[in-house]
Amino acid sequence: MKVVAQEEIAPAIFELVLEGEMVEAMRAGQFLHLRVPDDAHLLRRPISISSIDKANKQCHLIYRIDGAGTAIFSTLSQGDTLDVMGPQGNGFDLSDLDEQNQVLLVGGGIGVPPLLEVAKELHERGVKVVTVLGFANKDAVILKTELAQYGQVFVTTDDGSYGIKGNVSVVINDLDSQFDAVYSCGAPGMMKYINQTFDDHPRAYLSLESRMACGMGACYACVLKVPENETVSQRVCEDGPVFRTGTVVL
């Protein structure tokens, strides 16, 4: 895919715009497996898709520098090309939601980006969207303005430097509304909280982060156990990254 643009949107967090025919097949919640453009890094890097523009065959990826491979991605500029596998994963189930429904989005840190496309598509259908975001501090806050285009947004920070002090549970535990669906992505602690809080919700989903090797389900490097069945496992890359709450052990 061709690099259209790239900018640093927060300290060590970059937004990368790619263009190519692959965009036509993309869905909210899927990810791309990017090859680092050098000979020293053999493993691809999985990066979630934050927004999709099929009309212009473009997609946006937001990632954090977390090692030498992603540091190399941050040096890419307009006109460069990337070896990309994808789109991969199952994505979020957004079916059967319309103006009669209310949905909760919960994101934390670098797990926020895949929720942007979800919010956009649901808003286009008239769904009422409520978003709760959690970050470490004010410098880490991303996509609040973009998500606010599609509904009400609450922001929490661990140190209270922006928004409400605490984590997302401070807001969620006080929400009186009933939600027809819940979509979430974030750090392991946040995902455990969502998994427990919405354990019996029929349409609550977790988008899980995991280190991957092959990205195609063959190597079993990203497996999760299934509740009450030690012999069954789920692969984050192939069976996920989106799972219904209560269906995997976190």
Swiss-Prot record:
The keyword Membrane does not apply. Binds 1 [2Fe-2S] cluster per subunit. Binds 1 FAD per subunit. [2Fe-2S] cluster binds at C214, C219, C222, C237. Keywords: 2Fe-2S, Electron transport, FAD, Flavoprotein, Iron, Iron-sulfur, Metal-binding, Pyrimidine biosynthesis, Transport. GO terms for biological process: 'de novo' UMP biosynthetic process. Its cofactor is [2Fe-2S] cluster; FAD. Gene3D superfamilies: Dihydroorotate dehydrogenase, electron transfer subunit, Nucleotide-binding domain of ferredoxin-NADP reductase (FNR) module, Translation factors. GO terms for molecular function: 2 iron, 2 sulfur cluster binding; electron transfer activity; flavin adenine dinucleotide binding; metal ion binding; oxidoreductase activity. It holds the Pfam family DHODB_Fe-S_bind. Pathway: Pyrimidine metabolism; UMP biosynthesis via de novo pathway; orotate from (S)-dihydroorotate (NAD(+) route): step 1/1. FAD binds at R45, P46, I47, S48, I62, Y63, R64, G69, T70. Residues 1-94 form the FAD-binding FR-type domain. Signal peptide: none annotated. NCBIfam families: PRK00054.1-2. Heterotetramer of 2 PyrK and 2 PyrD type B subunits. Responsible for channeling the electrons from the oxidation of dihydroorotate from the FMN redox center in the PyrD type B subunit to the ultimate electron acceptor NAD(+). Belongs to the PyrK family. This is Dihydroorotate dehydrogenase B (NAD(+)), electron transfer subunit. It comes from Streptococcus pneumoniae serotype 4 (strain ATCC BAA-334 / TIGR4).
